[in-house]
Amino acid sequence: MKARAIVVTSGKGGVGKTTTTANLGAALAKLGEKVAVVDVDVGLRNLDVVMGLEGRVVFDLVDVLEGRARLRQALIRDKRVENLFLLPASQTKDKEALDPERFKEVVRALLEEEGFDRVLIDSPAGIEKGFQTAAAPAEGALVVVNPEVSSVRDADRIIGLLEAREVRENFLVINRLRPRMVARGDMLSVEDVVEILGLKPIGIIPEDEQVIVSTNQGEPLVLKG
């Protein structure tokens, strides 16, 4: 994937978007890239918790957007893996505090001034201002989808909005696949999801209780063992 600014989105909440962002960011950092993961879910931030960094948040994205903090002040370096940084969302503001144009400048600064190789943007669920802000600087997208009808339907809507914004380098992450349910005809197959949505899967992730354990422990699964 060539895109450097990538929005991780879904439409439907609870499909594993934040977990995907955290693990992909950690994996890319382990491969040697300098990575910033950015939480745009203002008012409902979780990326800091999933990464085990919630106790180190001093400034946040809205502080940067509104000029109360410099970008470097708000970035939190992960001590477990070199070159992985978090820009957390605000817990106390609402999404009206977001400004898509100013957010584009923040992402530009991360790439051009701070020297990041990749910026992963954790989008809020839905298609309102939070999504619009998260998608504004994106060159590509990872659409996280569960193999169920409601998730696929919402993902289809999101893909249309991304294409309307000329975000073209888009891929699927099919999460929480249960092969036994697929075999019984109780869950959509990978082929079903790909045919409906028309995007190539870049990752297929089976249901795994270790993901829940690692999330509760604040340690991305790719950093274990």
Named regions from a protein language model:
Residues 40-114, 212-217, 221-222:
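P-loop/Walker-type NTP enzyme "switch/lid" segment
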Residues 42-44, 92-93, 126, 148-150, ...:
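Conserved nucleotide-binding/hydrolysis micro-motifs of P-loop NTPases
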Residues 128-149:
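Inter-motif core of Ras-like GTPase G domains
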Residues 153-168:
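Conserved C-terminal guanine-recognition region of P-loop GTPase G domains, centered on the G4
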Residues 164-225:
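C-terminal lobe/tail of nucleotide-utilizing enzymes
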